[in-house]
Amino acid sequence: MLAKRIIPCLDVKDGQVVKGVQFRNHEIIGDIVPLAQRYAEEGADELVFYDITASSDGRVVDKSWVARVAEVIDIPFCVAGGIKTAEDAAKILEFGADKVSINSPALANPELITELADKFGVQCIVVGIDSYFDKETGKYQVYQFTGDEERTKATKWETKDWVQEVQKRGAGEIVLNMMNQDGVRNGYDLEQLNMVREVCHVPLIASGGAGEMVHFADVYKKTNVDGALAASVFHKQIINIGELKEYLAQQKIEVRR
């Protein structure tokens, strides 16, 4: 059995790490490089960096910090934000990232997934999906431009359908960002993850809702995800990654130590 991954997520805005609640009201957490170093030292398996306003601003990730991060950590990391072309992706990978993640640009141009997978290999290509449960319709809907409160909008895609579509086009991994749970810290949406897992045949990473160690145990025991991504519990030092791994190992969950 493959070890379950613990993945801190760093939302980047104007060169600093920020964190919001349900994708709104972002506060500054700190500088990118020291945080990346801290998480690598604590035992994170991987890091994910989202330049959260790149897509809505119509620009690509600022690459200067990508190279600085690559210099100071020795674990894999993934970078997302406004990657619209193979050239954009190539530059980020050249600067030292191990994977690139696309979200809004994939919705605007689904062919991009195939192009990147063909050029760099599926193992490098992650698709982020921002999924919102609409209580009125009872459906999970994919949202776009979620880094900008004024531009964020529902797309025509239901979550399950988009998960199937991106796999057909060459996504090597899917990060499911569950918007209703984001930053609220009351647990992952296990029902949604199980629904997505039924149609997801590539590694699936849960994102949104971690508040205490038991939430990680629950998501691994009850949904068969490959990894769990979290932000505020790590940024605010509510949970230490080393201690989390000890706890999960005691719960008979396979983790890298």
Swiss-Prot record:
Its main location: cytoplasm. It is an enzyme of class 4 (lyase). It holds the Pfam family His_biosynth. The keyword Amino-acid biosynthesis applies. One of its GO terms (molecular function) is lyase activity. Pathway: Amino-acid biosynthesis; L-histidine biosynthesis; L-histidine from 5-phospho-alpha-D-ribose 1-diphosphate: step 5/9. One of its GO terms (biological process) is L-histidine biosynthetic process. The active site is at D11, D130. The keyword Cytoplasm applies. SUPFAM superfamilies: Ribulose-phoshate binding barrel. It catalyses: 5-[(5-phospho-1-deoxy-D-ribulos-1-ylimino)methylamino]-1-(5-phospho-beta-D-ribosyl)imidazole-4-carboxamide + L-glutamine = D-erythro-1-(imidazol-4-yl)glycerol 3-phosphate + 5-amino-1-(5-phospho-beta-D-ribosyl)imidazole-4-carboxamide + L-glutamate + H(+). Its EC number is 4.3.2.10. PANTHER family: IMIDAZOLE GLYCEROL PHOSPHATE SYNTHASE HISHF, IMIDAZOLE GLYCEROL PHOSPHATE SYNTHASE SUBUNIT HISF/H IGP SYNTHASE SUBUNIT HISF/H. Heterodimer of HisH and HisF. This is Imidazole glycerol phosphate synthase subunit HisF.
